[in-house]
């Protein structure tokens, strides 16, 4: 299993980057004994000004053939943390690669959303795409703690 976080834009040094790195390091430590691989963070920039379509091309080229494509989108399905953990466990148990895609400021191209195995939302509000990275990294860590039976996730 390979786990990719594909994101448009480069996260500069600062609190958001620190949080993403911290949560992904926690995920790696917690997930390794569970058979979850470290997250490969891929950042893309459309330097030619092609917008969402060019960004979609860059993301699509990076996604491994046969990988489950999960897109973060305001129109996506709102999952609970345990439901997200169940998805992650299912992909792990089936040996399927997973690519989690976060679009730029304008979102993701419709053709990439249509191709997704799962469109996921962090609620009906729109979030800055750089903050979504932090939220997704935290949810990955939370999912690993749920699968490990750790007390981090409380209901």
UniProtKB/Swiss-Prot annotation:
Tree of life domain: Bacteria
Residues that hold S-adenosyl-L-methionine according to the record: 72, 103, 122-127
Entry keyword set: Cytoplasm, Methyltransferase, rRNA processing, S-adenosyl-L-methionine, Transferase
InterPro entries assigned to the protein according to its UniProt record, in alphabetical order: Alpha/beta_knot_MTases (IPR029028), RlmH-like (IPR003742), tRNA_m1G_MTases_N (IPR029026)
Main location: cytoplasm
Cell compartment(s), UniProt: Cytoplasm
A GO-annotated cellular component: cytoplasm
Keyword Cytoplasm tagged: yes
Reactions this protein catalyses: pseudouridine(1915) in 23S rRNA + S-adenosyl-L-methionine = N(3)-methylpseudouridine(1915) in 23S rRNA + S-adenosyl-L-homocysteine + H(+)
Assigned EC number: 2.1.1.177
Pfam families: SPOUT_MTase (PF02590)
Keyword Cytoplasm annotated: yes
Entry's Gene Ontology molecular function annotations: rRNA (pseudouridine-N3-)-methyltransferase activity
Assembly mode: Homodimer.
HAMAP family (UniProt xref): 23SrRNA_methyltr_H (MF_00658)
Primary role: Specifically methylates the pseudouridine at position 1915 (m3Psi1915) in 23S rRNA.
Family that this chain belongs to: Belongs to the RNA methyltransferase RlmH family.
Protein name as annotated: Ribosomal RNA large subunit methyltransferase H
Organism: Cereibacter sphaeroides (strain ATCC 17023 / DSM 158 / JCM 6121 / CCUG 31486 / LMG 2827 / NBRC 12203 / NCIMB 8253 / ATH 2.4.1.)
